[in-house]
Amino acid sequence: MKELASGAGAKVVDVVNQQLTKPTQTYVGKGKLGELLEIVKREKIDTIICDDELKPTQQLNLENALPGTKVIDRTALILHIFASRAQTHEGRLQVDLAQHEYLLPRLAGQWTHLERLGGGIGTRGPGESQIETDRRLARNRIAKLKKDIEKVRQHRQRYRQRRKRSNLPIVSLVGYTNAGKSTLLNTLASSAVTAENKLFSTLDPITRKISLRNGKEILLTDTVGFIQKLPTSLIAAFRATLEEAEEADLLIHVSDISHPNRYEHCHAVNEVLGNLGLTDKPKIGVLNKIDLFPKNYQAHEDTSLIKLMDQFDQTVFCSAETGFGIGELINVIECRTSEH
């Protein structure tokens, strides 16, 4: 969560944890609420970020209990990061839809809600209250965005059909955000895809034709990075993008093995793949960023790494940054796509 907050440009001053048996009206218990109030006053905090999706009433109650603060939940934070990363028309459409669907139940009757989203201002109908007008405008915007995204989906489907006629194997890179997928695509394709040390630096699928050593060619696609507790609204909004993984003949699941939560990240990716019905899709596990380990690192003695490796039928250690292990990965890709 700290990594997400930093990725959104926030300075994390303090972290407060609590386990509750059931949700409260303010998201936290009374004692923890008092602790938060003390921290807010002492550190002059202006923003509280919660690592869950809050109900609209919880968000409002928490803001009222902590005067002068803005309360943001996990979904809003992820949407903010996605919005700042979206570069293409398709990416912006998908983020815009997810934002509107998130904010619709949170509209409080102020025009500023829709102005923040870039929505248009309409004429209020006879006997229509302000909040009804806001909601009508939001629903109209959502309907239009869904139509536009459906056009994008159909365009992608036609494009994929043309690709299939080429009879080239399709390989998709999947993985947790910032695992190194774009860098790996660059290394394999010697292309100039954006590869930054940022969360969600890739929101739109990018496909490159790769020539393998055996003379055969494949189509390699980079996809949007996954994340733990990925909001359902985002999965739905990015369906057109995620369909790239559905159409693949082979998935390359890239994991950042230098990250302390590498197993949890792997599980989160597998969970999303399961939701998409891709659990049984052929996969290669790429254990990336091995260059960040000391030279005397003994992988076979690392029980947490062994646990991670058990998630895959086949794994390859590599560094997309230095090129270590890329030759072995290419050999594995050649072998796994040779029957296509």
Model-derived regions, located:
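Residue-level signature of catalytic and energy-coupling elements of molecular machines
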Residues: 1, 48, 100, 138, ...
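Canonical P-loop GTPase G-domain recognition
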Residues: 67-119, 126, 279-284, 291-340
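Conserved P-loop NTPase architecture
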Residues: 2-170
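Hydrophobic residues at beta-strand termini and immediately following loops
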Residues: 16, 203, 210, 316-319
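Conserved nucleotide-binding/hydrolysis micro-motifs of P-loop NTPases
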Residues: 19-21, 53-56, 76-79, 224-227, ...
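Flexible beta-alpha connector loops of hexameric P-loop NTPases
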Residues: 22-26, 85-89, 130, 192-194, ...
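Conserved C-terminal guanine-recognition region of P-loop GTPase G domains, centered on the G4
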Residues: 2-6, 37-42, 54-64, 69, ...
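Conserved G1/Walker A P-loop phosphate-binding module
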Residues: 113-235, 242-246
